[in-house]
C-alpha cells in the first residue's frame, strides 16, 4: 500500500487541521501506518494562531491524492464527498474520524469509521489516544484543545457534548494553558475580518451540502461585531452571486456569528429562499434576518435546511 494521506475538509478550520495532524501521529504510533498529514487549504487566522502558539508547522496543501501518488486516504472532521479532496471518488477511503452527519458518501470496501455526536473531531481523536494508551505530546494536546474550542466556541455551542468539558480540562492541563484565557485569545484571533476581501470572507469556513438535488453552500464567519460585517453587505452579496454563478450553487447561506453574545445574522441568496425562511421560521428582509441563539452550523442550520429542502 502506498502512503496514506490524512486530511480534514476543504476550507479547513481549526478542528480539521488539528484532528488530522493528531490522527496522523496516532496512526504511526498505534497502528504502524505509513501516513502523511496534509491539508486541503491554508490555515485561517484562528488556526494559524494555534499552530504558532504550539510551535507546529502547517501541513502542506494538496489538491489531488493521486497526484501525490496516494491510493488511500483517511478523512477527519468530514465524510461527505463534496467537502473532500477533488479526486475522492478515485481513491480508497481507508478510514474516517468525524462528528458530523453521514451523507453523500459510499465506499467499495469496508473501512475504519469512528463517528460520534460530540463537539469536535479532536475530541474523538483524543479518546483514541487514550484507548490505545498513547501519550499525547504537549503540542498535539494544544492542537486538539484548539480544535475543540473552535468547534464549540469555548464549550458554549449546543453541539458541546457533556464529555467535552472533561476533555477540554484534560487537554488544557496536558498543553500547559489556562482554558478560558487561551480559548478567548484563539477565538478572537479568528475574528479579524477587516483584512479579508469579500470573496475570502465568504470562503473562510464554507461547506457544500447536497439537499434534495440542490447544491447549497453554507458559510460561517465569527465576529465580535455583526454590524461591522453588515456594513460590507452589498460587496458581500456581489461576491456571493459571483461564486454561485461560477460554482453552480443553487443557494448560499452565510452565518455571521457573534461569538460574545452567541447569536447569528443569516444572509442568504438563491433560488430557494422560501425554503430558507421556512427552515428558520423567519422572514428575510433585504436578504438577511437575525437568528437568536444560533452559533452552530452543524446543529442549528444544516439540519433545519435539510428538513426544509426535503419537504
From Swiss-Prot:
Which superkingdom?
Answer: Bacteria
Isomerase recorded as keyword: no
Alphabetically sorted, this entry's keywords are: Cytoplasm, Hydrolase, Manganese, Metal-binding
The EC number(s) given in the record are: 3.6.1.1
For this record, the Gene Ontology CC terms, alphabetical, are:
cytoplasm
Entry-linked InterPro entries: DDH_dom, DHH_sf, DHHA2, DHHA2_dom_sf, Mn-dep_inorganic_PyrPase, Oligoribo/pAp-PDE_c-di-AMP_PDE
Kindly list the cofactors needed. Answer: Mn(2+)
Quote the cofactor binding remark. Answer: Binds 2 manganese ions per subunit.
Identify which top EC class this enzyme belongs to: hydrolase
Name this protein carries in UniProt: Probable manganese-dependent inorganic pyrophosphatase
Amino acid at each position: 500500500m502506498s502512503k496514506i494521506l490524512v486530511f480534514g475538509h476543504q476550507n479547513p478550520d481549526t478542528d480539521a487541521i488539528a484532528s488530522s495532524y493528531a490522527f496522523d501521529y496516532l496512526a504511526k504510533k498505534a497502528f504502524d501506518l505509513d501516513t502523511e498529514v496534509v491539508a486541503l487549504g491554508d490555515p485561517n487566522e484562528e488556526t494559524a494562531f494555534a499552530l504558532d502558539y504550539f510551535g507546529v508547522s502547517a501541513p502542506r496543501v494538496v489538491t489531488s491524492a493521486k497526484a501525490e501518488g496516494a491510493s488511500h486516504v483517511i478523512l477527519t472532521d468530514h465524510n461527505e464527498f463534496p467537502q473532500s479532496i477533488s479526486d475522492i471518488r478515485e481513491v480508497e477511503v481507508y478510514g474516517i474520524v468525524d462528528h458530523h452527519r453521514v451523507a453523500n458518501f459510499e465506499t467499495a470496501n469496508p473501512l475504519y469509521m469512528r463517528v460520534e455526536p460530540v463537539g469536535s473531531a479532536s475530541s474523538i481523536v483524543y479518546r483514541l489516544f487514550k484507548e490505545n494508551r498513547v501519550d499525547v505530546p504537549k503540542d498535539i494536546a494544544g492542537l486538539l484543545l484548539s480544535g475543540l474550542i473552535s468547534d464549540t466556541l469555548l464549550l458554549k455551542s449546543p453541539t458541546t457534548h457533556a464529555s467535552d468539558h472533561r476533555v477540554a480540562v484534560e487537554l488544557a492541563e496536558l498543553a500547559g494553558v489556562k482554558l478560558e484565557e487561551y480559548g478567548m485569545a484563539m477565538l478572537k484571533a479568528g475574528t479579524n475580518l477587516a483584512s479579508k476581501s469579500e470573496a475570502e470572507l465568504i470562503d473562510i469556513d464554507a461547506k457544500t451540502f447536497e439537499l434534495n438535488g440542490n447544491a447549497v453552500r453554507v458559510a460561517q464567519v465569527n465576529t465580535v461585531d455583526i454590524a461591522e460585517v453588515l456594513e460590507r453587505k452589498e460587496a458581500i452579496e456581489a461576491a456571493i452571486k459571483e461564486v454561485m454563478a461560477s460554482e453552480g450553487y443553487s443557494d448560499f447561506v452565510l452565518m455571521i456569528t457573534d461569538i460574545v453574545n452567541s447569536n447569528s445574522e443569516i444572509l442568504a441568496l438563491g433560488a430557494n429562499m422560501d425554503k430558507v425562511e421556512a427552515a428558520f421560521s423567519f422572514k428575510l428582509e433585504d436578504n438577511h434576518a437575525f437568528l437568536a441563539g444560533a452559533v452552530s452550523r452543524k446543529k442549528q442550520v444544516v439540519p433545519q435546511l435539510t428538513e426544509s429542502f426535503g419537504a
